[in-house]
Amino acid sequence: MNQVLTQSRPIRLKGRSFLALVLSPELPLDGWLDKLDDLAARSVGFFLNRPIVLDLENVSIERPQLVQLLEDLVKRGVWITGFENARPSLLGPGMPPAMRGGQPAADFDPEITEPKSQERTPVAPASVQLVKAVPSMVVTEPVRSGQSVYFPDGDVTIVGSVASGAEVVAGGSIHVYGALRGRAMAGTAGNADARIFCRKMEAELVAIDGLYKTAEDMESRLRGQAVQLWLDGDYMMAETLN
């Protein structure tokens, strides 16, 4: 009599990278939560179903305060999936795990500045510098409401429009050959040289290397125009392309 032996398959372990937003709380926490409420009110659904890491490097906080902060964030629909730069005394059962190896990013700063004058002045001829090519993604269809495009490794080009409620996230620059009505976040891997280009600016939110502006922050003259955005230090600059 033959006996058939069935051996169960071993568990397969795979490695993957996932993109998460990093929040850096500041004291007093009540004031920081008020700013968070303001951002959420001006960009509805921004934190919905999104992994969030809490960076505790620049805040002196004890465990009871941290527990209360997590509860306050949950009430706002913000679920923390991990801590960065947390002291061992803050970790333990019932707390999110410690995260390591994340790329540093600039703090969110909603300051508004007027675009610099575009007056031209004589300049010396620019030197030619060779740079390494970066990966890119090209999306040949419109990005519809509720859809997200994530590409943390380089530039993203959308051959079409980005609808309200849609989202494009890129480690490099973002090019939209249509109307940008949703959210566009460029330079998410700490690339302050990233830019955002669009044929028609109607965005709910734009961000470069963590520095963001909502629709209410942007000048009315930019609405409906072909626009490029970039960073100048801690300020987001904008100019029309027409």
Swiss-Prot record:
One of its GO terms (biological process) is cell morphogenesis. It holds the Pfam family MinC_C. The keyword Cell cycle applies. Keywords: Cell cycle, Cell division, Septation. It comes from the Bacteria. Cell division inhibitor that blocks the formation of polar Z ring septums. Rapidly oscillates between the poles of the cell to destabilize FtsZ filaments that have formed before they mature into polar Z rings. Prevents FtsZ polymerization. Interacts with MinD and FtsZ. NCBIfam families: minC (TIGR01222). Belongs to the MinC family. This is Probable septum site-determining protein MinC.
